[in-house]
C-alpha cells in the first residue's frame, strides 16, 4: 500500500491513478460549473419575470400603430427607426414595471397571493430591482439619443414626448405615486395611448401631429381595461394597504360598467370607421368573440386571470387595427 499511493498521486497510467487524479477533480469542477450555470439561469429568469413581459403588448402595439399611420402619410417606414423606437419604449415600460414592483413591496401592497411576487418571495433583492430599473432607464435614454441622430424630429419635441413618458412611468408608483391616489388610470390612458402612438409617428415623419392622438383612442381604452381589471382584482388588498384606486372609489358594480365601456366602445368606433371610411377597419372586430367571455367573468367577479386575458385581447386587437390601417386604400382614412 505504501508503494501504490505515490503512483496514484503522480498520475500513473494505472487504474488507481486514472480514477484518483483525472476523474474526481474534473467531476467536482463540472458540478460546480453546473451549479453556477443553473444559478445564472434562474437569476436571468427572475429578472425577465420581474419585467412582466406579458404586459409589453401595451407598449408595442402603440408603436406599431404610430408607424402604420406614418406609412399611410409618407408612403414608407424606416425600419431602423421603428426598431430603435420599439426598444426605447420597451425599456421605459420595463423600468416602470420594476419601479412599480419596488414601491408596491416597500409600501406593503404586494403579498404572497399577489400577481408579482418577485420581492415577496425574495427571488430578487430590492437593491437588484432598483439597479436593474436604473440600467433600463439609462439604456432607454441612449436609444432616445440615437433617435435624435436618426430622425429629423426636433430635439425639443423628441425630449418632450420621450421624457414625458419616462416621467409618467416612474411617477406611476414612484415619487408622488399617482397610482396610490386614484390617478394611475389617467397615466395609463395618456402614456400607453396617445403619447406612445404620437412618439412612434413623430420619429418617422419628423414633426408632431394631432392625427395619432385621435387614432390612439380605441387602443388606449382597451389598454386601460387591462389596468382597470387588475385594480378591480386587487381591490381588497389595496384597501388593506391604505391606497386608493379608481376601482375602489367606484366599487364592484360601477367597476363592471367601466370595464364594459373600456372593452366594447373601441368596437363601436371600429364599426363607425368601417362603415363610413374603409372596410379594412372592420378587422379588429374579429377579436369581438374574445371580449364576451371576459365580460362574463368580470360580471361573475372571477377576476384572477382577467388582466392577462385582457392583455392578450389588447395585443390581437392592436395587431388587427394596425393591419387595417396598412391595408386601407390611399386617401380612405380620415385625416382631420
From Swiss-Prot:
Predominant place of localization: endoplasmic reticulum
Region (Disordered): 1-22
Keywords: Endoplasmic reticulum, Golgi apparatus, Membrane, Menaquinone biosynthesis, Mitochondrion, Prenyltransferase, Transferase, Transmembrane, Transmembrane helix, Ubiquinone biosynthesis
Composition-biased stretches (Low complexity): 7-22
Localisation per UniProt entry: Endoplasmic reticulum membrane; Golgi apparatus membrane; Mitochondrion membrane
Membrane topology designation: Multi-pass membrane protein
Disruption phenotype: Cranial vascular hemorrhages and pericardial edema, leading to complete cardiac and vascular organ failure by 72 hpf. Defects are due to increased oxidative stress.
Enzyme class, broadest EC rank: transferase
One Gene Ontology cellular component annotation held by this UniProt entry: endoplasmic reticulum membrane
Pathway stated in the Swiss-Prot or TrEMBL entry: Quinol/quinone metabolism; menaquinone biosynthesis; Cofactor biosynthesis; ubiquinone biosynthesis
Catalytic activity: menadiol + (2E,6E,10E)-geranylgeranyl diphosphate = menaquinol-4 + diphosphate; all-trans-decaprenyl diphosphate + 4-hydroxybenzoate = 4-hydroxy-3-(all-trans-decaprenyl)benzoate + diphosphate
Protein biosynthesis is among the record's keywords: no
TM annotation in the entry: 79-99, 129-149, 158-178, 180-200, 201-221, 254-274, 315-335
Annotated GO MF terms: antioxidant activity; nitric-oxide synthase activity; prenyltransferase activity
Disulphide bridges: none
An example Gene Ontology biological process: cellular response to fluid shear stress
Family listed: Belongs to the UbiA prenyltransferase family.
PANTHER family (UniProt xref): 1,4-DIHYDROXY-2-NAPHTHOATE OCTAPRENYLTRANSFERASE, UBIA PRENYLTRANSFERASE DOMAIN-CONTAINING PROTEIN 1
Purpose of the protein: Prenyltransferase that mediates the formation of menaquinone-4 (MK-4) and coenzyme Q10. MK-4 is a vitamin K2 isoform required for endothelial cell development. Mediates the conversion of phylloquinone (PK) into MK-4, probably by cleaving the side chain of phylloquinone (PK) to release 2-methyl-1,4-naphthoquinone (menadione; K3) and then prenylating it with geranylgeranyl pyrophosphate (GGPP) to form MK-4.
Record-given protein name: UbiA prenyltransferase domain-containing protein 1
This protein's encoding gene: ubiad1
